Amino acid sequence: VVTSMGGLPRNIRMAKAPPIKCQGIKTKLVPFIFRNIRWNESKGGRWIEPFLGSGVVVLNLAPERALLTDTNQHIIHFYQAIQQGEMTPAAVREYLFHAGRQLEQQGENYYYEVRDRFNRTGSPFDFLFLNRACFNGLMRFNQNGEFNVPFCRKPHRFTPAYITKITNQISWVSCQMRGKEWEFRVASWEEALRVASPDDFVYLDPPYIGRHTDYYNHWDMNDTLRLAQAMRQLPCGYALSMWLENRYRRNGLIDMLWDDLELRVYRHFYHIGATEELRNWMLEALLIRPGFAVPIHAQAELGSHRQSHQLSLL
């Protein structure tokens, strides 16, 4: 994976996964995103993500300068802890080894003990543990802002190999950040857009309307309309990820709000059950400000690529 080429576009075969998981994570879409966006990083601008989520896009891009915001303070504090050297690979390995052993011995009782502790203290180590030990890797908070996802029922989850995998992800994140001017900030998307300058590039990955929302991820039509209006005021390039179509319906918002943007489409499949018959397709849209999209014919220079991939939603 190329980590620094002066912006975009670039060709990568496969993106690396971050240490935390969340719904709608874009790991498999990163190569598609990188092929289609044009951004000249050498002008000194920042890569801005107002909806950081898992951080998978910026971590694979590894720009020199970035503003990374989210309303979920736990995501921001997690990456700040890595950036500031609190969560080193060695510290994470030691923590997960101990926590994994306790989970084996006490089962779900230990999981809920950690969950209660996290909801009191907000420890980034506990956040990582819960994210990897909870049901389906969900990240969900109740109306009081408390993590409320149940246990995954796998007390032997933290095997030596699994701990090594997570530790390596922490090491990779630390490496991608090192020497970079990245600002992680707990902030609304409005605050992030407000400080954008002409040489920046804004990548937007808002929650989907209709998908489960929680304390940190409430999103409705009014939010979408406000975002669409705010995007028009940006002084720089931007791109928006949004679902376009599945076998049941098409997202009418794209034609209604963003028909003037460059549209790039990625087709993938996901399973909703154990059999082949339950495999569904989905079209994902990348909507790019005119002048900042890589022409389709120019993408051949970046290398051939498959148009359809198997994609896990988690």
Can you say where each PLM-predicted feature lies in the sequence?
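Short, glycine/acidic-enriched loop or turn micro-motifs at the edges of active sites
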Residues: 52, 73, 191, 208, ...
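Conserved S-adenosyl-L-methionine
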Residues: 36, 43-100
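Glycine/threonine-rich flexible loop motifs
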Residues: 212-218
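Conserved beta-strand segments of alpha/beta enzyme cores
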Residues: 65, 181-183, 262
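SAM-dependent nucleic-acid methyltransferase catalytic core
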Residues: 2-43, 85-203, 207-212
